[in-house]
Amino acid sequence: MTVERPPESSVEPAQPGGPGVPRPIVAGVVGGVSVIVIALSAWLALRPGAEKAQTGLVHWFNDPPQPFAALFAVANPFLRPVPLAVVAIVLMGWVLLTRPGSAHRLAVMRAFVATFLLAQLMTQVLKHVANQPRPIHVIPDLDTHGYPTSPHGNAYPSAHTAVVVAAVCALWPWMRWPQRVAGLVFAALTACNRIYIGAHWPIDVVGGIAIGLLSGAITWLIAARWPIQETR
């Protein structure tokens, strides 16, 4: 007499922390690489002649050829401080509306707030460490393209880039593919815009991207270690 075994479920066990939250090893690799990039980019930013080496690329972004000129000009009004914050909040709201269950929504909000605070903290600390002037204070006749105020503080790293990349990275596990595409476009345009208006050097943007990825990776670890359970 043979005993039939119950069929095995074809459904894979859910990842801890929510749908698609990367495993701790993945978050650790992303975070580790980001730390290396931050250290290397900060070192390069402080090297003698760093501004001169990047001047040509700054000129290209400040007065780019078509179709980049048209693309940057259209995106520019939406990437100023207030519109940028609105776009980021709208992106988070879009993700919230498409995630079922209060636990997922709470996880999204926790990730968004945590990554914002982490990115801001890291950028402000590094701005006090890296004493690098902004391109508009070094290169004459740069076009700010209507930026409402003169950027304050040191150039390295780009806080705007760091925060936007951090938000997209942190929310990535809960995003559907259209939201991921929109997030990547948003982050790429923000990074390019910071050079376009003369507020940052390319190395500042590289540092900002790395800080954003590190902040996002930390929120992945938080989501995996302390998942928010659905209440009944």
Regions found by a protein language model. Give the residues of each.
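Membrane-embedded catalytic cores of phosphoryl/pyrophosphoryl-handling enzymes
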Residues: 94, 140-232
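Transmembrane helix-loop junctions in multipass membrane proteins, especially transporters and channels
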Residues: 46-50, 99-103, 128-136, 198-203, ...
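Interfacial segments of alpha-helical transmembrane regions
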Residues: 24-33, 90-122
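Membrane-helix interface segments
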Residues: 67-68, 102-108, 136, 175-181
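Hydrophobic alpha-helical transmembrane segments
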Residues: 76-99, 163-164, 168
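N-terminal transmembrane-helix/juxtamembrane module of multi-pass inner/ER membrane proteins
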Residues: 2-87, 127-148
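Aromatic-anchored segments of alpha-helical transmembrane domains
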Residues: 37-41, 117-124, 185-199
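Transmembrane alpha-helical segments of multi-pass membrane transport proteins and ion-pumping complexes
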Residues: 120-124, 128, 213-220
